[in-house]
Amino acid sequence: MAEEANKDADISSLSLSLDPEIIGGQNNFLENNLQQIFQKIIQERGPFRDLKEEDLQKELQKESIKDESSAKSSETENVLEFATLDSKRNVNDTEVESMDSQAYKKELIEQIMIAQTECSLALDMTSLLLSKFKENSIETISPFLKSTVPPSSLQFSRSQPPESKESDATLAKCWKEKSLTSSCKFLFEAKERLTSVVETEHEYYTELVKVKEASWPLFNSQGSNHLSVQYSCLGGISLGLGLIRMKPESKSFEVQSSLLYSQAALKISILNKDRDEIGSSTWSWPSQNCNSVLLKDIYKLQEILFEMDIWNSLLQEAQSCGNQGVNFTGDEILVPISDDHVVRITLETSSKNTESGFTEDKKSNEDTSTNFVTIKQEKELLKCLCDTLNAIAHILFLKHCRKSDRRSQQPELYMAIDANAPLILRPLIFYYNLNQESLEFQRWLKQRDISFKFMPNYPWEKAKDFLELENSLSINRLSISWRIMVSNFEPAIFIQHTPTLHGTDKSVWRCKDQYSSNQFSSLKNVCQYIEHHINSLSRRSKKTE
């Protein structure tokens, strides 16, 4: 009860002045007692809608006269003060005293009038809308609107249509024609777009069918709507996946790969003692007879990757061939074949393959026709030798990539590297050394006028297909027979040469005459044996004489 009495006392002491500067200082009190303040305003001022602007202006004039006659400090001690509407003003500012209070009051009244008009209009429209359903809503309508507008007038079911004109039919027809024309154009453009999409999809899957019929495996790429083709499945040890996509500019399909080179080929050259190239061979693949551009791209990528795999395998094998004089860097592999000649193996990655040829010095232009023919023949022989070495390297690498269990004439290839190192350089060195050793033995026999018959038994000469050729080139042991006729009256000497690529068997020369059978581990010992045999025959002939 004491608290309610204090509240009544506080409200009774509240001054309802129209000057906003007089009210202030007790904002919390006003916020907590707004309902009681509204009751006091209605008691003293009456309903808000009955107020008139003239009465408010007269009251403002009276208050302004009263404010001018009283002291500013004594009259505002027991009066609540409201904060000014302008947030930028400060109560402690010294410029507040010099402001024109009349202009500020006028601005406040204008804002109140605007708010009153908006609230009154909103109340009238809401009451007029609800007057059809609630009868007491009529009481909140303003007297002027109540006298001019009937209740529930906002609920009319329809408005009166305008009068029809002769041009309405023509206008409607024009709009319909325009609508049909635009719809037809839109449908035609949609048809063209769909036709283009369907034709592109048809062409795309037609190309995929051609790729699939050519035995190229296709895979679904994760995170992409396009398929990938494995272009290394027919050879090589790398995976080789390419994404099949369409070129936006040419509307054609291509295989996007991660290869660094647009063209690659293995090149084998022969260098002289001055490191000049006297013969070379760059590998080239035969052209594929196919009408599909996509298949041609796949074959090209396969050839590039295959050549890169051969080069990587040669580098891997060269690391274990140092005892045979093989030197290698990241760009070339050097294999010595004699004191004056070296075989160089490189990977050509230029856009155009360089033509292999014989490097002639300036003196070759002054040679006679006989020397020219000799040089030309030497050039052809060197070119043939390089081509042979290049072909054998490709065959041995293909053998390295194949599985051990083959099926008929179409063996499957696998992508993993064998546990054993590749066998490409070592067989080439083995075949070349064997040939040089045979030529050296023949020259030695000719110098001594010894008749002989060379009877090699090379397994690749009997190969009937490509698989047998692969197997024959990778055979570990060969067999070469010699028939030496030292005299017309004595039986011939039979020599069986069995060179081995691997192993610890050193007795590779087996010599048999009418008196004994011997085994030797080198050609030098064989030559000494033949000389000893000839000397023995000569001594016997002298004794008989």
UniProtKB/Swiss-Prot annotation:
One GO molecular-function entry: transcription coactivator activity
Main location: nucleus
Family in the record: Belongs to the Mediator complex subunit 17 family.
InterPro entries named among the record's database cross-references: Mediator_Med17
Protein name: Mediator of RNA polymerase II transcription subunit 17
Assembly information from the UniProt record: Component of the Mediator complex. Interacts with med18, prk1 and rbp1.
Compositionally biased spans, kind Polar residues: 149-162
Cellular component annotations (GO), alphabetically ordered: core mediator complex; mediator complex
Pfam families: Med17
Subcellular location: Nucleus
Species for this entry: Schizosaccharomyces pombe (strain 972 / ATCC 24843) (Fission yeast)
Region (Disordered) location: 148-168
Function according to Swiss-Prot or TrEMBL: Component of the Mediator complex, a coactivator involved in the regulated transcription of nearly all RNA polymerase II-dependent genes. Mediator functions as a bridge to convey information from gene-specific regulatory proteins to the basal RNA polymerase II transcription machinery. Mediator is recruited to promoters by direct interactions with regulatory proteins and serves as a scaffold for the assembly of a functional preinitiation complex with RNA polymerase II and the general transcription factors.
Keywords: Activator, Nucleus, Transcription, Transcription regulation
GO-annotated biological processes: positive regulation of transcription initiation by RNA polymerase II; regulation of transcription by RNA polymerase II; transcription initiation at RNA polymerase II promoter
